[in-house]
């Protein structure tokens, strides 16, 4: 799969390395942008407050599968949109998913060696499912579909709560897993 990541930081950079290792062709853009025309999938992993500006610097986004890994810890979605993911869909017109925003970049590289497999909650368009599930499994995680893109604002809010859980624990960062009892 040809993937463009918009963002080279903890999430974007780590996923790019893992996907390259899994055999995907990955191009990384910083906030300066570039041309994503050749991409099958575009990962948006920049700070939420710069999403609108960053998008103006990327061409070739029309109709692409867009994976939104942003979190709006302090920023609000662009005016008129309940979530950043829905804003991204409106700008690109392609299948969109809110995904990889509930994971910690520092732990992503360890996911493949973790048992049971950590979960990766996502919401989004059905047309994005194949890409989301393949790219999630390719890094050693289990995709957990939570519903349609209209739930992206709920997932964004959950990210804030997850940061509270992490901040309240002495152990630091964490994986999460939802599974039937017989899988543990």
Regions from the language model: what does each represent?
Residues 1-34, 38:
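NAD(P)+-binding Rossmann beta1-loop-alpha1 motif at the extreme N-terminus of oxidoreductases
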Residues 3-5, 44, 122:
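Hydrophobic Val/Ile/Leu positions in short beta-strands of Rossmann-like dinucleotide-binding domains
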Residues 14, 18, 91, 135:
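Rossmann-fold NAD(P)-dependent oxidoreductase module
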Residues 28-29, 95-101, 144-146:
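General beta-strand structural signal in soluble alpha/beta enzymes
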Residues 33-65, 69-72:
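Rossmann-like NAD(P)-binding element
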Residues 61-62, 91-92, 139:
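Short, structured coil segments at secondary-structure junctions
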Residues 70-113:
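Rossmann-fold NAD(P)-binding glycine/threonine-rich loop
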Residues 118-184:
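Active-site-lining helix/loop region of Rossmann-like oxidoreductase modules
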């Amino acid at each position: 799969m040809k993937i463009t990541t918009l963002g080279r930081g903890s999430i974007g950079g780590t996923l790019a390395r893992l996907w390259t290792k899994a055999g995907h062709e990955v191009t990384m853009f910083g906030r300066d942008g570039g041309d994503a025309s050749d991409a099958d999938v575009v990962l948006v992993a920049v700070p939420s407050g710069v999403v609108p500006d960053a998008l103006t610097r990327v061409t070739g986004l029309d109709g692409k599968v867009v994976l939104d890994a942003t979190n709006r810890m302090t920023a609000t979605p662009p005016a008129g949109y309940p979530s950043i993911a829905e804003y991204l869909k409106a700008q690109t017109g392609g299948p969109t998913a809110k995904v990889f925003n509930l994971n910690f970049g520092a732990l992503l590289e360890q996911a493949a060696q973790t048992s049971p497999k950590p979960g990766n909650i996502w919401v989004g368009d059905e047309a994005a499912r194949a890409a989301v599930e393949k790219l999630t499994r390719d890094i050693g995680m289990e995709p957990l579909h939570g519903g349609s893109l209209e739930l992206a604002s709920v997932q964004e809010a959950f990210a804030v709560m997850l940061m509270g859980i992490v901040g309240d624990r002495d152990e630091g960062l964490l994986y999460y897993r939802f599974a039937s009892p017989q899988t543990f």
